[in-house]
Each structure stands twice: as structure tokens, then as C-alpha cells.
Amino acid sequence: MQQTKKLTHSDITIAVMSGPFLQRGEPALVSKWYRTKMALACGVDLVVELPYAFSTQKAETFANGAISILNALHVSEICFGSEDGQIENFYNTISVQKNEEETFNRLVKQFMNAGNSYAKATSEAFLHILSSEKNIDMSQPNNILGFQYIKAILMQNSSMQAQTIKRFASHYHDETFNDQHIASATSIRKQLFSENSSFTEIESFIPKATASLLASYKQNYGTLHNWEQYFSFFKYKLMTMSPENLRHIYEIEEGLEHRILSKIQTSSSFHSFMESLKTKRYTWTRLQRACTHILTNTTKEEIYCANIEQHAPYIRLLGMSQKGQTYLSKNKKKIELPILTHTKTFDHPTLHIERKANSVYFSIMKEPLRTQLLKRDATHHPIRYDETTAKFL
């Protein structure tokens, strides 16, 4: 965050944040409201939500949704972390892909026909068409997402400028901590759910406010969220579904329903299920997203009706600092998308999916807490934060 502000000299900082389920196809550790508090306490001025129809998607769709929201908010500059760290290399890579589009598409098809996943096929195709050191490594997850952010900016004819900060010492999927006080999201998650885990092991890797709010969430609600907590319901749901039912679920393609229904029979945990399910053709992340859609019962028709090929249909405001509130007041008339401070009275197919996702996310809570949290989510007004006193209002 501090590096972003230093690099961009920004007047205000806006974060677009996923809701209950994330791009890797897994539940967020804590609710979006707690994560909003974390962001505000760490210097973000406006926190807005990326709808489920974008947040649980491949990088291209995820980026399109995020950029459309930032564009609507009249953001002048975007900053993202990447393994490469040189913004010129991203633009060079986009230029090469555009010039070699026919060859690139042919190579992707060729590698997929050989049994590779789409992600692996695209990575291999890029290896074949990119020869200069001034191009990015498209096998790295943050490079891929950054590449799609810039493509979305160009596709949406936005005047937004892009900057990137090099990630170092820890990669996104690293499962262990290093001695440089930098940790991946994966390693932090693994530590939090390990036997006899405590927050002391991660305190040196995350901001103090984040550690405090994580501990507070666990104390107040008795849990942090991960896939294993949803597995019993997930397995029961699959055991009562036919292949025909499953085929209606978004991202269930090419006979995947038969493999899923076969492997669930002998799986006693989500991890063991995923280990038996993954293949060369389907990456872990791709399968986790499909499982998330099964869990939330999100169908192909629902996603189609939500118009995910278009831009985000609204902006759900989750939180704001005093500076962020001033920015919104000054620019509200220029912002073309509706800004939602709650969802109680607004209606849209995208929001229907969002409500289902929230219901599933809180399903692991005991009653009456579960019902209270669901009701509160629809009526919850944006969290306000006074950055001068470092207090929530």
C-alpha cells in the first residue's frame, strides 16, 4: 500500500475487493466487512465490492469487472503487484500477442488438444511467440492478472494509466514462510489452519490492524473460513445431483460432471477430493472455481443473465475514509453506475447471485447468528473510518 502511494502520488486510494468467494475458487478467510476494516485501517480511502459474477472467474473476466468499476469511479491510475515489476514489459507483451494473434490462437488450440489446461496452453503459446527479455513471463499468476488488467484498460478505451510493483521473496502459491518478513497468501492460510496454530506466527507478515481483526473475527464467530468447513454440505449436494443437474452449473463442461460425481463417492475431505479430481487438463484453481459454483448453485443461465461479458452493473460501496467520502461527494454526479450503500431494495440478476453466495458463505455459522449475519449483510451501510484519529465511526 505504501509503495503504491509512493509510486502513484495518489490523492485517494480505491480498492476493489472480492466478496465472500475469491478468484481462486475458495471462501474468504473472514467476511467482506472485516476485510473492509482491514483495508481502511491500512490506508485505503474507498472500498468497493467486485461482484461474484466477476470475482470467481478466470483472470480476463475478473480484470474486466474490476477495471469497469475503477473506470466508472474516474480512477486515473491503477497499481498492481507482479513478478516482473516492469510496466513496459506488459505493454510489449500485449503488442506481441496482438501482432501474432493468429499464431497464438492456433498454438493455444494445439496445446489444449494435447490435453493441457487452458492456463497451461496459453502459457506455452506465449513461450513460443515471446522471444525478447522485454516481455513478461506468462506462467506467473500475478503477471497474468496484470496483463489482463492492462488489456481491459485498452479494451474499455480507458485513459487510466497502469503501474506495477515487483513482488519479491515470496510467490503467490508459496506454502512456507521465509526469513524476510514477506509471506504469500497461500502460506498465511496454511499456517492459520495448521494444528495448534496461533496468530503469533503470522503477526510479523501482516499489518497489525489485520492481525487484530483476524483474531477478533475468530473470537466473535468461532471460526475462519476454508473449504473443509463446507465439505459436508458440498458432498451431500453432489450425492443428490444427477449428471444432468450438474451440467447446468457454470463451468461444468466436457463431461467433467461424471468425473466429479465419481470422485466424490470416495472422498472424505475437500483436499482429498481435489487431489483425486485434478488432471493435466484441469488446474486446481479452475476446479475450485467449478466447485464454488456447485456450492452456490450458480448456473450457466444465471451467469448469462448477469451479463458478465459486459461491465459491472453497479458499485457496492463497502467502506470509506473521510477523504474517500469527500471524493464521492465531489464526483457523484459524474459516476454513471448506481452506487449501492445497501442492497435491500436494489434488484439485478448479478445481485441475485450475490445473495446466494452470501447465504452459503454464512451457512457454517450456528443459528441465530447465521440469520442475523445474512440480514445484516443486505442492510449494512458502508463502514466509515476517520483516518485522522484512526477510529471507525
UniProtKB/Swiss-Prot annotation:
GO cellular component: cytoplasm
UniProt keyword terms in alphabetical order: ATP-binding, Cytoplasm, Ligase, Nucleotide-binding, RNA-binding, tRNA processing, tRNA-binding
Pfam families: HIGH_NTase1
Superkingdom as given in the UniProt entry: Bacteria
UniProt EC number: 6.3.4.-
Catalytic activity of the protein: cytidine(34) in elongator tRNA(Met) + acetate + ATP = N(4)-acetylcytidine(34) in elongator tRNA(Met) + AMP + diphosphate
Binding site for ATP: G81, N142, R167
Subcellular location, principal: cytoplasm
Subcellular location as annotated: Cytoplasm
Main enzyme class: ligase
GO terms of molecular function: ATP binding; ligase activity, forming carbon-nitrogen bonds; tRNA binding
Signal sequence region: none
InterPro entries tied to this protein: Rossmann-like_a/b/a_fold, tRNA(Met)_cyd_acetate_ligase
Entry's family note: Belongs to the TmcAL family.
Function: Catalyzes the formation of N(4)-acetylcytidine (ac(4)C) at the wobble position of elongator tRNA(Met), using acetate and ATP as substrates. First activates an acetate ion to form acetyladenylate (Ac-AMP) and then transfers the acetyl group to tRNA to form ac(4)C34.
Name of the protein this chain belongs to: tRNA(Met) cytidine acetate ligase
Phylogenetic placement of the source organism: Bacteria, Bacillati, Bacillota, Bacilli, Bacillales
Gene name linked to the record: tmcAL
